[in-house]
A protein has these predicted regions:
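Extracellular, repeat-based ectodomains that mediate carbohydrate processing or recognition
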Residues: 1-233
Length: 233
């Protein structure tokens, strides 16, 4: 979920059929201009509440067993166009990758962000130990273009806090770099979004963490918390 500069609430979600994470499927969208009282599709069509699998707007169809995570990152451009960042396996022969799904004109487009080389599965119940994090996605105007930034963590990059930047979605080239020098384990990114919205400054909350698969118990000692302040972007 995110709230744009005009106060519109943008909401995206996936459906799950059972407690098994692998049954996650499909990416849906709704928006509200009155604080959540009434909801609309991106087309302007008003939802008849409650929103169900039958009447929801499907912005991208993703089948079960696609390693689709059940939490998405969201932001909106200056004109209120929503952007959704998440990851899934786009085709049975492909590896799980990060993608940006974004509204452009009257439709939705998809841009592949990563080129990962390592496979994994989300099959099974409980909290999973996953080699990549859920993403945080941000956007800003830079040099007259709507720039998109995605913060994430990936074991292929030694579990550092990393960022992928696309300077022009009409020519979606993503440049990936690391924001720190030390791995942060199973860290999931979080940032001060109000500071980003008001001043364009990125402050990240960092802490070395450990997630044991299937609700296991970690033996890691308590770790210090620190803030990575406004890295060069």
């Amino acid at each position: 979920m995110c709230i744009d500069k005009l106060g519109t609430i943008h909401l995206s979600w996936v459906w799950r059929e059972t407690g098994d994470v692998s049954t996650n499927h499909d990416l849906c969208y709704a928006r509200s201009m009155d604080g959540g009282i009434t909801w609309y599709k991106s087309t302007g069509e008003k939802y008849q509440l409650p929103i169900t699998a039958t009447n929801a707007e499907y912005v991208y169809k993703i089948p079960q067993n696609s390693e689709l995570i059940n939490t998405t990152g969201m932001c909106a451009s200056d004109d209120g166009s929503p952007m959704i960042a998440t990851y899934w396996r786009d085709g049975v022969k492909n590896l799980p990758q990060y993608f940006l799904v974004y509204q452009e004109g009257n439709g939705w487009k998809k841009s592949q962000i990563s080129s990962r080389k390592t496979d994994f599965t989300l099959s099974g119940g409980g909290t999973k130990r996953i080699p990549i994090s859920r993403p945080v996605v941000l956007t800003r105007k830079k040099n007259g273009m709507q720039q998109v930034l995605m913060v994430f963590r990936d074991s292929e990059r030694s579990d550092k806090a990393s960022i992928a930047i696309c300077s022009d979605l009409t020519k979606p080239l993503w440049v990936i770099s690391d924001l720190n020098k030390i791995g942060v384990g199973s860290w999931e990114p979080s940032c001060d979004k109000q500071l980003w919205a008001e001043k364009g400054l990125l402050n990240l909350y960092l802490q070395q963490s450990d997630q044991v698969d299937g609700e296991g118990i970690s033996t890691m000692a308590p770790q210090p918390v620190y803030v990575l302040e406004n890295p060069e972007l």
